[in-house]
């Protein structure tokens, strides 16, 4: 019976780990699981947005610094994937829970809200700090606009050709 109780306790602990924020997670930073949060880190005069993964102690039991996944060199969705994969590996997360989290990419607006909250807490994070967070969205928007601009130019060429032909036809009929 004691073994059964320990197994049930371990399962409850695991379910809480993969379905709720850690109780010590500060407001606006939680992503719905223990050990994975949204953050801004000060680096000199800059504020760097990142997903942060809590790490297990090293082999000697010493705490390790969180691993930060920033948006400087990769798009938002890829950074989320990398952070979730590392979190799952670091904390021995089951495949189904890892996959569930991979499909729930938080909106970049999370970082806008976090920036506001942290500024209310006394920080001074400029809006420019969000630039790398929204880069993927800006690139996608630019990609959808480019074909529309090409189509618009082609339609204008067709319209101009039609107007020239129509004017020529009118002039010759007169």
Question: Which residues does each predicted region cover?
Answer:
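Basic K/R-rich, polyanion-interacting modules in nucleoproteins and related proteins
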Residues: 1-51, 104-174
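Nucleic-acid-interacting cores, centered on viral/eukaryotic replication and modification enzymes
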Residues: 98
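A short, exposed loop/beta-hairpin motif centered on an aromatic-Gly-Thr core
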Residues: 62-78
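Short loop/beta submotifs within extracellular cysteine-rich repeat domains
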Residues: 59-61, 91-95
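Short, well-structured beta-strand
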Residues: 47-64
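Long, charged/polar, surface-exposed segments that mediate recognition or autoinhibition
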Residues: 10, 73-75, 79, 87-90
């Amino acid at each position: 019976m004691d073994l059964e109780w320990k197994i049930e306790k371990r399962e409850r602990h695991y379910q809480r780990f993969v379905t709720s924020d850690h109780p010590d997670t500060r407001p606006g930073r939680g992503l719905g699981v223990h050990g994975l949060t949204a953050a801004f880190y000060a680096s000199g005069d800059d504020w760097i947005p990142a997903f942060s993964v809590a790490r297990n102690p090293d082999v000697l039991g010493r705490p390790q610094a969180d691993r930060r996944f920033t948006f400087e060199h990769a798009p938002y969705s890829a950074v989320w994937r990398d952070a979730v994969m590392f979190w799952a590996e670091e904390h021995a997360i089951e495949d189904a829970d890892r996959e569930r989290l991979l499909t729930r990419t938080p909106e970049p607006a999370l970082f806008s809200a976090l920036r506001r909250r942290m500024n209310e807490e006394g920080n001074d994070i400029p809006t420019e700090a969000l630039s790398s967070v929204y880069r993927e969205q800006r690139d996608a928007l630019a990609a959808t606009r480019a074909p529309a601009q090409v189509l618009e130019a082609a339609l204008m060429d067709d319209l101009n050709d039609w107007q020239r032909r129509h004017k020529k036809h009118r002039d010759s009929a007169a």
